[in-house]
């Protein structure tokens, strides 16, 4: 599972998910991509399960890029704990995703295979997504 080696702060604020993504919205590495249409937190487990699906389709012929990284720790308190006594301990890591962000990119496979692969990976995501192709610049 993905997680940072070290962070500046152990227990950050939750933040909000307003607005659209302004960076990471265009395909930068591959030919085809999976783009988020809704805001959410995507856990490192969800990212990993999507990666496994895509590597099965891509095999050795293609290449895969994961464009999001879970860098935000989510804290939880033990069940049955009374109110107060501070913030909980980090339980898992999430990537903050805004609408328009590219999640995965692939290349080296045909378009129907890429479409099927990214559709299968989209089932693993907790949000609506869409298949995007690289724009050909004239």
From Swiss-Prot:
Q: Which Pfam families match?
A: Ribosomal_L16
Q: Does the keyword Cytoplasm apply?
A: no
| Subcellular compartments | Plastid, Chloroplast
One GO MF term attached to the UniProt entry: structural constituent of ribosome
What SUPFAM superfamilies does the annotation carry? Ribosomal protein L16p/L10e (SSF54686)
Superkingdom as given in the UniProt entry: Eukaryota
Q: Does the keyword Protease apply?
A: no
Q: Which UniProt keywords apply?
A: Chloroplast, Plastid, Ribonucleoprotein, Ribosomal protein
Report the principal subcellular site. Answer: plastid
In terms of InterPro entries, this protein maps to: Ribosomal_uL16, Ribosomal_uL16_bact-type, Ribosomal_uL16_CS, Ribosomal_uL16_dom, Ribosomal_uL16_sf
Question: GO biological process annotations for this chain's record?
Answer: mitochondrial translation
What Gene Ontology terms describe where this protein resides (cellular component)?
chloroplast; mitochondrial large ribosomal subunit
Family to which the UniProt record says this protein belongs: Belongs to the universal ribosomal protein uL16 family.
Q: Which NCBIfam families does the record match to this protein?
A: rplP_bact (TIGR01164)
Subunit and interaction comment:
Part of the 50S ribosomal subunit.
HAMAP family named in the record: Ribosomal_uL16
Name of protein = Large ribosomal subunit protein uL16c
Q: Which organism is it from?
A: Tetradesmus obliquus
């Amino acid at each position: 599972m993905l997680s940072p080696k070290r962070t500046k702060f152990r227990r950050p604020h939750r933040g909000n998910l307003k607005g659209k993504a302004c960076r990471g919205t265009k395909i930068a590495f591959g030919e085809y991509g999976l783009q988020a249409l809704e805001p959410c937190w995507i856990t490192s487990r969800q990212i990993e399960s999507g990666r496994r699906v895509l590597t099965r389709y891509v095999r050795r012929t293609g290449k895969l890029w994961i464009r999001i990284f879970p860098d935000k720790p989510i804290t939880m308190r033990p069940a049955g704990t009374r109110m107060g006594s501070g913030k909980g301990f980090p339980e898992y890591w999430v990537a903050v995703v805004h609408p328009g962000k590219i999640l995965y990119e692939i290349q080296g496979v045909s378009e129907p295979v890429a479409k099927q692969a990214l559709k299968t990976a989209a089932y693993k995501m907790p949000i609506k997504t869409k298949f995007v192709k690289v724009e050909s610049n004239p």
